[in-house]
Amino acid sequence: VKGYFSASGRFRSDDMKTSNVLAFVGSSAGCTFFPDHVTRSDEESYPIEIKTYPAPKFEGGGDYAVQQGAGMVVIRKSDEQVEAAARFLKWFTQSDWAIEFSVTSGYLPVTAEDNDMVKIEKDSPSMKKNVRDSLGTAVQVVRQNTLYTSKAFKNGMSARKKLEYAMSDAAKADRQRVVEAIENGATQEAAVAAFVSEERFDAWYAQLMDELNELAAQ
């Protein structure tokens, strides 16, 4: 609403590569896409250093963190195919390979035992700094929080999309009204006042909950 947020590339790491943003919120899996240089033009680029932080918590809130990632399932097939899939999953989650996959992809290892930075660094001493920093932060979050993942339910994908875009869509619409007010002579402070208040947030939240409840009732 104040003009400090931007999302023009496909991913926020793309916006960082072009100096369009200074910081972004992303998953640990995004660390493999972190740029080490910012390119402003064909003639100008410069190196950057990246710091990763745990997701913030609400004041007074509990120690919870959202966990999600790529899932694997075995669908109903022949006994031979089911056994082959089970063998693959068992191999895929074994310690040595799980850590190797984690380092190359940014995803965390499957087992609690393997979520150990001493073990990860010992097995992969040459991993990139961005990956090391991101995995270190992610492992810290796993060990210091109770993990939560959303359950599957009817219209769950629609609800997820609504949650993904509800705030950004509202902010874009409000920002447009702020720009129009400034063009008509209002100050920045006066133009944004009505859109950054507790009342505006409460109204947005109430509307969002109504829309989610409507989806859940279908």
Regions found by a protein language model. Name each.
Residues A65-Q68, L89, I99-F101, K128:
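Glycine-enriched catalytic-core subsegment of oxygenase/oxidase enzymes
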Residues V139-Q218:
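Conserved C-terminal helix/tail region of periplasmic/extracytoplasmic solute-binding proteins
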